[in-house]
């Protein structure tokens, strides 16, 4: 186990009241959070989203990506379902960090795509570690999920880490003229399933 569960509190939102559960990485002290809606116990697979931190999309309403749109849609789906989990995975910019993400944006402004920009900065296309999310699910007592994602690699990694993904639920929202090239690159170079 790479994490420990350290704190929890009620979080009222426009979608209803969630239980916010805080986790800490044992090796680094980095924190992550889960938003739990309703009763997630029992044998029925839980609707869940692993949402990687995106300050620009989630908090600053950037149209360069689909992250903020996906966050809102995931919370809506979970609330409509009556139960579910959103793991907020604190690995900004596919885990290159905020400042490097800004540098990658500058390279994209010069014509590089999102993958090429990461490579120019010395990073892989995706530096995230989703095994942390498997540990969060386990610490919440969940081992079967219906995963809201367009990323088959996320399904593969979570499955290898012991989480039974019984269904991949598409989450295709937020396409706009500012992020079309970004989304097309994620589909073509990273295998994301983003049918237009």
Curated annotation (Swiss-Prot):
EC number from the UniProt entry: 3.5.4.25
SUPFAM superfamilies: RibA-like
Keywords assigned by UniProt, alphabetized: GTP-binding, Hydrolase, Metal-binding, Nucleotide-binding, Riboflavin biosynthesis, Zinc
Reported cofactor(s): Zn(2+)
GO MF entry, a single one: GTP binding
Binding site for Zn(2+): 54, 65, 67
Class in the EC hierarchy, top level: hydrolase
Domain of life assignment: Bacteria
This protein's pathway: Cofactor biosynthesis; riboflavin biosynthesis; 5-amino-6-(D-ribitylamino)uracil from GTP: step 1/4
Note on cofactor: Binds 1 zinc ion per subunit.
InterPro entries the UniProt entry points to: GTP_cyclohydro_II (IPR032677), RibA (IPR000926), RibA-like_sf (IPR036144)
Binding site for GTP: 49-53, 70, 92-94, 114, 149, 154
Catalytic residue positions: 126, 128
Claim: Hydrolase is one of the keywords in the record: yes
Keyword ATP-binding: no
Protein name: GTP cyclohydrolase-2
Organism: Citrobacter koseri (strain ATCC BAA-895 / CDC 4225-83 / SGSC4696)
Top-level taxonomy: Bacteria, Pseudomonadati, Pseudomonadota, Gammaproteobacteria, Enterobacterales
């Amino acid at each position: 186990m790479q994490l420990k569960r350290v704190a929890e509190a009620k979080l009222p939102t426009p979608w209803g009241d969630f239980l916010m559960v805080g986790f800490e990485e044992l090796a680094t002290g980095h924190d992550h959070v889960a938003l739990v809606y309703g009763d997630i116990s029992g044998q029925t697979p839980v609707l869940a989203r692993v949402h990687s931190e995106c300050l620009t999309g989630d908090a600053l309403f950037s149209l360069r990506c689909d992250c903020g749109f996906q966050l809102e849609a995931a919370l809506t789906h979970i609330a409509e379902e009556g139960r579910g989990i959103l793991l907020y995975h604190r690995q900004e910019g596919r885990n290159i960090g905020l400042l490097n993400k800004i540098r990658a944006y500058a390279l994209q402004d010069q014509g590089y795509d999102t993958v090429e920009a990461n490579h120019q900065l010395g990073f892989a296309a995706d530096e995230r570690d989703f095994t942390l999310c498997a540990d969060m699910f386990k610490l919440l007592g969940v081992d079967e999920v219906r995963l809201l994602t367009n990323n088959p690699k996320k399904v593969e990694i979570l499955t290898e880490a012991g989480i039974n993904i019984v269904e991949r639920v598409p989450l295709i929202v937020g396409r706009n003229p500012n992020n079309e090239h970004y989304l097309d690159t994620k589909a073509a170079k990273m295998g994301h399933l983003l049918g237009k």
